């Protein structure tokens, strides 16, 4: 009986945690690490698809290998255990947000995204109630409201602002798409071996890319990562120049355009220098081509003729001498 009652609660909490992560803003105050995103992905896959039975992707798919390793590391963990681990990881993330992000810098709707978790997870970490009352008009835990409805206040509390369109994910995504909870992280993960690990530019809701677009972006990022060391000297600004964090799509496009322009200028400069070197007059010694020597041993023409003709001259003189003696 206890198990039958526990499974629906665990699944309900799991679905609520998935919904919260799916709705987190991309440009929020908290940026999860790569390890956290991979853990969320692995727990989700284990909870929805079971143990990893698919073969490991090839070397040409580094993102798939990262995700496969994270999923495969869970072994034969049951789906209920994976859901529980997912919820536990969600609690750790919520506590980390409370501990690391100053409450004075948190947007008013920041903790509004976690409100569904407060309704189904009683021990979900939450900020001080005074802060919740001040920024969101939150009065009491939603669990108590389910038991006993609270009276309406004299003035309606301030509703949490809905996420902006640019930070909100498409709602037509099915749950299976969300299982790849590091889809939007793929360009950043490709750069992990090249750049030092820094907080990701995008937040956890990174599921709006399809399989084809994801593969194209991975291939483009692989080429960009392979040529980064070659273009660093000629690049107008390196990736580390953007505030010490990874670049967003627009910043990456601007940086790539600048890099290509710098490379083109470098190639033009090299070509111009080569033309200048080719057009310079060569020194006299180099201009004077080595003179062909038709005569052997470097002998002059008269000397060579003398060596050729002297036997005949001697023979003729000898004959003249003999003729005169007779």
From Swiss-Prot:
GO MF annotations in UniProt: fatty-acyl-CoA binding
Q: Name one Pfam family in it.
A: ACBP
Q: Which UniProt keywords apply?
A: Lipid-binding, Phosphoprotein
Q: Which residues carry this modification: Phosphoserine?
A: 164
Please list the GO biological process terms of this entry. Answer: fatty acid metabolic process
- Which segments carry the region annotation Disordered? 147-170, 223-248
Superkingdom classification of source? Eukaryota
Q: What's one GO-annotated cellular component? A: cytoplasm
Under the heading InterPro entries, the entry gives: Acyl-CoA-binding_prot_CS (IPR022408), Acyl-CoA-binding_protein (IPR000582), Acyl-CoA-binding_sf (IPR035984), FERM/acyl-CoA-bd_prot_sf (IPR014352)
> Where does the ACB domain start and stop, copy by copy?
10-99
The reply on keyword Cell membrane is: no
What residues bind an acyl-CoA, as annotated? 21-30, 41-45, 67, 86
User: What does the function comment of this entry state?
Assistant: Binds medium- and long-chain acyl-CoA esters and may function as an intracellular carrier of acyl-CoA esters.
Query: Can you say what this protein is called?
Result: Acyl-CoA-binding domain-containing protein 4
Q: Which organism is it from?
A: Rattus norvegicus (Rat)
Q: Which gene encodes it?
A: Acbd4
């Amino acid at each position: 009986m206890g198990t039958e009652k526990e499974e629906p609660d665990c699944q309900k909490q799991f679905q609520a945690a998935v919904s919260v992560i799916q709705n987190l803003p991309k440009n929020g105050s908290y940026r999860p690490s790569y390890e956290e995103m991979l853990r969320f992905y692995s727990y989700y896959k284990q909870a929805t698809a079971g143990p990893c039975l698919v073969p490991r992707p090839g070397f040409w798919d580094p993102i798939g290998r990262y995700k496969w390793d994270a999923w495969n590391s869970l072994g034969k963990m049951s789906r209920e255990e994976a859901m529980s681990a997912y919820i536990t990881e969600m609690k750790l993330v919520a506590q980390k947000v409370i501990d690391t992000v100053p409450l004075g810098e948190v947007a008013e709707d920041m903790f509004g995204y976690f409100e569904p978790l407060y309704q189904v997870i009683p021990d979900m970490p939450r900020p001080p109630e005074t802060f919740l009352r001040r920024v969101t008009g939150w009065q009491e835990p939603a669990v108590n409201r389910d038991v006993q409805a609270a009276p309406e206040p004299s003035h309606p509390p301030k509703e949490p602002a809905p996420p902006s369109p640019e930070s909100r994910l498409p709602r037509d995504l099915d749950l299976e798409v969300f299982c790849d909870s590091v889809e939007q992280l793929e360009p950043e993960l490709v750069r992990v071996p090249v750049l030092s690990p820094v907080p990701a530019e995008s937040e956890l809701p990174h599921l709006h890319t399809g399989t084809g677009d994801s593969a194209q972006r991975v291939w483009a990022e692989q080429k960009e990562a392979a040529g980064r060391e070659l273009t660093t000297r000629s690049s107008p600004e390196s990736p580390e120049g953007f505030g010490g964090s990874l670049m967003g799509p627009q910043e990456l496009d601007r940086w790539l355009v600048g890099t290509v322009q710098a490379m083109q200028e470098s190639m033009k400069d090299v070509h111009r220098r080569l033309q200048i070197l080719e057009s310079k007059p060569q020194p006299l010694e180099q201009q004077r081509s080595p003179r062909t020597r038709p005569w052997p041993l470097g002998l002059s023409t008269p000397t060579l003729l003398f060596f050729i003709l002297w036997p005949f001259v001697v023979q003729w003189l000898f004959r003249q001498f003999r003729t005169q003696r007779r």
